[in-house]
Amino acid sequence: MGDGLDAVQMSGSSSSQGQPSSQAPSSFNPNPPETSNPTRPKRQTNQLQYLLKVVLKSLWKHQFAWPFHAPVDAVKLNLPDYYKIIKNPMDMGTIKKRLESAFYTSAQECIQDFNTMFTNCYIYNKPGDDIVLMAEALEKVFLTKISEMPQQEVEISTTAGKGRGRGRRDPDMNMKVGPVLEPLTASPQTRGLSNLTPGPQTRGPPQGPPTLPPQPIVQIQALPPRVPPSLPTIPLHAPQLGPPFSLGPTDCNPPAPIITAVPPPTQTALPPVHIQQSAAPPILQTPISIPNKRKSQKRKADTTTPTANDQLNESSPAESKSGKTLPRRDNTRPSKLPKKEAPDSQHHWTAAPGTPSPKQQEQLRYCSGIVKDMFAKKHAAYAWPFYKPVDVDTLGLHDYHDIIKHPMDLSTIKDKLETRQYREAQEFAADVRLMFSNCYKYNPPDHEVVAMARKLQDVFEMRFAKMPDEPEEMLAPAPAPVLHPAPVKTQPVMATASSSDTSSDSSSESESSTDDSEEERAQRLAELQEQLKAVHEQLAALSQPQASKPKKKEKEKKEKKKDKHKKKAGVMPALEEILEPPPALKPQGKPKNKDPLPKKSKKLSKKEGGKSNRSMAPPGAAPPTLQPVPGLDTEEDLGLTGGAAMAGMAAGEKCKPMSYEEKRQLSLDINKLPGDKLGRVVHIIQSREPSLKNSNPDEIEIDFETLKPSTLRELERYVSSCLRKKKKPAVPEKSMEAISAVKTKGTSSDSGSSSESSSSESEDSETGMASKPKKRGRGEGKKAHHQTTAPGMPLPQVPLQPQTPALQPSIQLKQQQPQHPSPAAYMPPPVTALEPSQLLENPFDPLAHFMHLPHHANDSSSPAPPHLNAHPPGGPVSPETHPFLNQHPILPSPALHNALPQQPSRPSNRAAPLPPKPLQQSTSQQQPPPQQTLVPPQQLQPQQQQPAPPQQQHLPHHPLHAPQQMRPRPLSPPTLTPQGLLSSQPPQMLLEDDEEPVPSMSLPMYLQHLQPNRLQATPTSLMQSLQSRPQPPGQPSLLQSVQVQSHLPPPQLPVQTQVQPQQPAPHQPSPQLSQHQARHMQQLGFPQGPLQTAQTQPGQHKVSMPSTKAQQIIQQQQATQHHSPRQHKADSYNSAHLRDNPSPLMMHSPQIPQYSLVHQSPSQDKKEPQRGPSALGGIKEEKLPPSPVMRGEPFSPAMRPESHKHPDSKPTMPGHSQQRADMKPLEMSRPVIRSSEQSGPPPSMQDKEKFKQEPKTPSAPKKVQDVKFKNMGSWASLAQKSSTTPSSGLKSSSDSFEQFRRAAREKEEREKALKAQVEQAEKDRLRKEQEKLRGRDEEDSIEPPRRPLEEPRRRQEPQQVQPPPQQHQTQAQAQTLNPAQSPSASQPTQAPPQSPASSQSALDQQREMARRREQERRRREAMAATIDMNFQSDLMAIFEENLF
């Protein structure tokens, strides 16, 4: 890119062109400016090339450039006076031609032409004219580009033979610069005017903006005539200008000429390395030629500076310019060489002046990084005036040297750093401060340059203050690799270690980038890509076994600490870090040692690192390496850890060094990581790289070359673990990567994505305590448990679900561990039982034990989980019953695999993994374990969905739906298992099971316990509170369910809060009872947990009903009105249907029903309590009788046991019997309530129950679904909402064989459901009426305590009630039940008293319900504009119903 007119023209044309106005006064236009001069030697420099390829190219394409493309046509534009006023016309067309013809001898000339062009425009035109505005815009772009121009001008010419040093450099130049030189030489551009060089160097004052300060340097370098042979081969790429700039200013220093005597051998040795590193070496050599263009010195022209006149020219503009530049370059190369490679050491001869101690060297490297940072683009806006020596001539500052006796600039400082003229950092700081002092001294305080100096000084002082006190490692070994990657953009702090090398490299790279960058870059990229591929392969190989390394525990400890700081990073990185903690401290500064191509590859990597920010990024190899950390410029990192780099090599080499291919693959893999996992990557790097400890975790610039092998291996392990997890679940479920992407986005609408994000985030973020189990789950699970332990469950699952199980299990383990100690042990129920407890011991030990119990307690069910397909529990339970109880997981597992959304098994997984606990819980969890064990594939998805609970937090978009989905999933295992909801829930029941049962049972309990904390309680705190409260052994299951939901509750709380806002206080008063009930329900079928939760919540609601009975009843009634018809019907036919083929529907419409379930689940929860109290008998008849009828099949004890259905639960198991015992109070209260309610609405309740039984009767073998049926009550309500939805949803998602079988059942159930819905609607009306009467009485007694809670519920319920009118009707129907149920639920023992109380408060309740309904209607109307998840779920349910 040309400089512009010749020196003469430049001087002549101070403002020759204004706008493209006519150039001729009137009749003619003068001849255009000269574009070629055969008498002038053609010269091409890196800066001229930059001006042509970058500056002119960008300006030419600018939208405002068209007026300047050609000389002003004064005739055409009718500007007769233009050429009278403008004596030196100039235009971009002329400049372009001059650049292309190598007319300019220095970039300063071209810049002068540009300035003349702009000045002419400003002179001839009025200030506000459009052409002036266009010119200003163009000038701004021009100045911006110029600020990025290489600071040192290096001649690029075919005459490369000058200088002995050049002898070796010639090959270098030929390799790097040669190609560039040849093309340049071929084109007129290469012509450098050796004669003119002095003139250009004088730097005709740029008429343009002062941004030309770099120009002086360019001019100095522009002394090509003598130097052309010298290798001013390739200034850093024009893009690299910023960093390279520093070289330019230093080039001007007079000392350089003296240093010019560069030992030819050194330079000779240097060239090859130089080429690879960058064209900078020539620049270094230029000092040899002294002022004569560092080029000649670079080229190893005689150490005697043949181009002394250059020095004179340079020195005239600025003493420091000419002198400094040459020595700097010369020394720069040597400094680089010793650091990077032996070849570079050639230039070391110049470094001889001072041999600082390792500490000083490290600090000087850091200083070099600071300089680099100051040359970075981010500071260019205010740093550009300091890039080069003050151009006194160009700027017309004739008194400058009178006032400023010791001029200083960044280029001079950089050159001095590179030539090792500084013995310690303080000397460097003194020069930098001198530069700023000169600025403050010469310029007035209000001058813009002073403001810019202050800004830049702030940057410098901050960076300098952070300089490491102690050398991290010898800079010689590690810096070389580091320097390469740390081109211009490397963080100055990090580049300190390699700063001198880095700066020289950056300058050389920028210089040579244009010449050799293309060819060498392609070669380097190819090599790097190959190396990265090899690295990637190694990483893949290493990543698999690495998890089992013995160091894992140590890493876990470290990781745990790290996880606390960076929960989002992910467990695997911590594990990886644990594997190689000592190596981490050691920088990977010796990539060269690692690779057979240490020097070349290092250079490549260095350029990759350094250039990758600029040019390497595009190449596949280097950019990937840099990509992982976008701003990583390890060069500077190494610079910071230059001393440490060598030590790091020693230690790092202990670990197998990474090949460039491996590094490339690692960078690619890091780029694949979701955003939430990158924190871990940064943490690993910072924890293992002392030089990066203080770096900004949000933005780190590192070069893989500077990282210690141990750090790289740790990163490799972590990334591979993350990607493996992603990919494994991705196969069965949508794709772990996609999931992780969703995870990264924080959107876990997909259970798959939720599982993914849950796995990573729940591990790290769910709980500090959980983080350890998570890590163990991942590390141990992957390694030790990879086989069969809870953490290993993922691997066991892999066998079950070959592709996703391993990853998902690990993910599940992570969340399960946080949520439940047992979830990790899902896959192998027995082993997992132990593992989960162990894993969960830290965060959730009690739960872990309880969770373990379910597996054992699930003897019938627990075996089933492992043998879900086999239906081992089928013995106790009919095949259908068993499949749903124990096969819920089985069927859901396919469905879950098919559709991530329906991963209720995940909750079951949580419940299941804790089989070792009491049988009661085992009973409740029994079904979840079946889900977990029965369907490892399902578990994978459940596990993924267990991560999904964390996603629930991420699923705020579906406040009710997502939260419940997430929580229900943790809880869904119980719910699903009990009713086979897992299989049938996907459309509605699964969702309800997951959402409502979980909210009902676990969430209500959770809310009751948590409500004082109200949704604020964290899963851990929730679990802790529940655990602290577990009164009976059975309670742990409730706690487990709550804990399962503890991760889930925040999302679920909205729905459940609606149902339970009033309950929390009452429930807390009787947490034991409610917990027992919930626990027993869970014990009866923790998988039933959701349904049981619904029932338990009713029980709990009943328990708390005395205080919040009216509110709960009203809210529940409203919910019942919304959900009751469908829910009851769905309960009736869905229970049977779900039991028969729960997984099809559940699996088919997991996502859609999830929403409906979510919104319906609260209402269903309410309905169940309503049914419990108002028609407890009805509910029991509905649920217990229907569930028996539906579960007419021998329901497995684990599946069947429900506290609500004592008959069923009794047959189930002792734990279940206990649950029954605990539940009996609930049931007793319900029966009492039932009797009281039945007095009025018993027929309706019974009819409804009959209807439910009728639909469920077909699935009578599904006795296991007693508990499920209760959950199914809500689930069935959803199914009934979409009468065909449950069956249809179940069909679609069920296993193929299950789908067929369920399809037939669903058809029957649909018909029954339709009938049941009609009957239920009538029954609900009767119930509502009766309940209203009872509720009024109850409300009178309960109204005071209930009202406070009622308001939140009203607010929450309106959301639930808003969506579907059917839901409103259901709620209305259920409301009648709820008043009765609420009292009975509030106090199972108080049920009889509450019956009268409910009758007493019936009027109050009715009034309150009427108020609530009206309020809800108004709220619904107000909320009509908002998206109601409940409504959407209803729509989905209806849609699914229509599908079948």
From Swiss-Prot:
Protein name per its UniProtKB record: Bromodomain-containing protein 4
InterPro entries linked: BRD4_CDT (IPR031354), Bromo_Brdt_I (IPR043508), Bromo_Brdt_II (IPR043509), Bromo_chromatin_reader (IPR050935), Bromodomain (IPR001487), Bromodomain-like_sf (IPR036427), Bromodomain_CS (IPR018359), NET_dom (IPR027353)
Low complexity: compositionally biased ranges: 11-27, 498-511, 746-760, 800-823, 919-954, 1036-1046, 1110-1121, 1282-1296, 1367-1389
Domain NET positions: 633-730
Function according to Swiss-Prot or TrEMBL: Chromatin reader protein that recognizes and binds acetylated histones and plays a key role in transmission of epigenetic memory across cell divisions and transcription regulation. Remains associated with acetylated chromatin throughout the entire cell cycle and provides epigenetic memory for postmitotic G1 gene transcription by preserving acetylated chromatin status and maintaining high-order chromatin structure. During interphase, plays a key role in regulating the transcription of signal-inducible genes by associating with the P-TEFb complex and recruiting it to promoters.
SUPFAM superfamilies: Bromodomain (SSF47370)
Tissue: Widely expressed.
Biased composition (Basic residues): 549-569
